[in-house]
Structure formats: structure tokens, C-alpha cells
Swiss-Prot record:
Positions in coiled-coil regions: none
Name of the gene encoding the protein in the UniProt record: rexo2-1
Keyword Nuclease listed: yes
Protein name: Probable oligoribonuclease
Function according to Swiss-Prot or TrEMBL: 3'-to-5' exoribonuclease specific for small oligoribonucleotides.
Length: 190
């Protein structure tokens, strides 16, 4: 009997091993009322090398939507400049989904590559709600760096967590998440 692992992928090739890194900034975390403000995307290979940094889009929202953000978002999105960028943006949610879908289709095949990021299950919920066609392009599995962080704190408390700036802008958060996973790869998964 063979001990070679089997995979559910139709073809295992370099393209099928890619990771689709996404980060969203939202008006809050309440899926029933909050919305996406910013989305960035980066494609990496299995070794965490960046293949291409994709669009980093700020979606226009009304002042009414911005006024109803929770206190944390009002403070942090105000400090980061995101609130003002949202006011000035000309990009609709529909346009943003179309642009992101074109980008991800250029680099991945439908249903093959996982969504990656930090606490990315939250991003996935908002993608399913607001950008379902984009979300459906991705595999149902996710690579969540925050899971590794939490397990490392418990199982390897002597290994320091990588330092992060936490600027709360989408592209910067993705870049930090990729670096964080690289760090865990050499310290925890050695």
C-alpha cells in the first residue's frame, strides 16, 4: 500500500499551490450592517514568494455609512487616512469586485487556491456577502496566520511573535501577514 499522500486537486502544479492573500478594512465586524471599505490582494507561491501585488482599492461609501462606523473604526480609519480616502474614492463595490476578479483569474484557476491572511475568516464572511463571485473563485479552505499565532503562543511560548506595525491599511496588513508566516515557517515549522 502506498504512503504517498493524495490530494483533491485535479492537477498539482505550481499554479495550483498559490495563495491568494486578501485583507479588507470594514466599517466594523457586524456582518448584518457593516461593509467593506478597502481591499488589497497579493498572490504568493507555496514558498511565500510574491508573484504579484494586485490592486489595492478603496471603495466609495456615503457619509452616512462612515458616520455609522463603530468607535474603533472611526478612530483608526481616521488616523490611517482611510476615511478620507473612502470619501474621495470613485470606485463602486461592483467595480472593485470586477477588478479583483480579473486579477485573481489571471493568477489562479477557479476553486483551487485558498484565501490567506490574518483572521481571514472575517474577510471571507464579508466577501461572501459583498463580493460573492470573487469569493466563489477561491477554494473553500483558508490559510489563517492567526491560527498559527495562537497555537504558537500556547505550544511554543518561548518563541517571540513577529512584531507588526498594525497600520490597519489593507496592503500593509497583507505584507505583514506574509512576513509573519515566513517567520513561523523558520521558527515553528522547522
Amino acid at each position: 500500500m502506498s504512503t504517498t499522500p493524495t490530494y483533491n486537486h485535479p492537477v498539482i502544479n505550481e499554479r495550483s499551490k498559490r495563495m491568494v492573500w486578501v485583507d479588507l478594512e470594514m466599517t466594523g465586524l457586524d456582518i448584518s450592517k457593516d461593509v467593506i471599505l478597502e481591499m488589497a490582494i497579493v498572490i504568493t507561491d507555496a514558498e511565500l514568494n510574491v508573484i504579484e501585488k494586485g490592486p489595492n482599492l478603496v471603495i466609495h461609501r456615503s457619509d452616512e455609512v462612515l458616520k455609522n462606523m463603530n468607535d474603533w473604526c472611526i478612530e483608526h480609519h481616521g488616523k490611517s487616512g482611510l476615511t478620507e480616502d473612502v470619501r474621495n474614492s470613485k470606485i463602486s463595490l461592483e467595480e472593485a469586485e470586477k477588478i479583483m476578479l480579473e486579477f485573481v483569474r489571471k493568477h489562479t484557476d477557479k476553486g483551487i487556491c485558498p484565501l490567506a491572511g490574518n483572521t481571514v475568516h472575517e474577510d471571507r464572511r464579508f466577501l461572501l456577502k459583498e463580493m460573492p463571485t470573487f469569493a466563489e473563485h477561491l477554494h473553500y479552505r483558508i490559510i489563517d496566520v492567526s491560527t498559527i499565532k495562537e497555537l504558537s503562543r500556547r505550544w511554543y511560548p518561548y518563541i517571540p511573535s513577529p512584531k507588526k506595525v498594525c497600520g490597519h491599511r489593507a496592503l500593509q496588513d497583507i505584507e505583514e501577514s506574509i512576513e509573519e508566516l515566513k517567520s513561523y515557517r523558520v521558527t515553528v515549522f522547522k
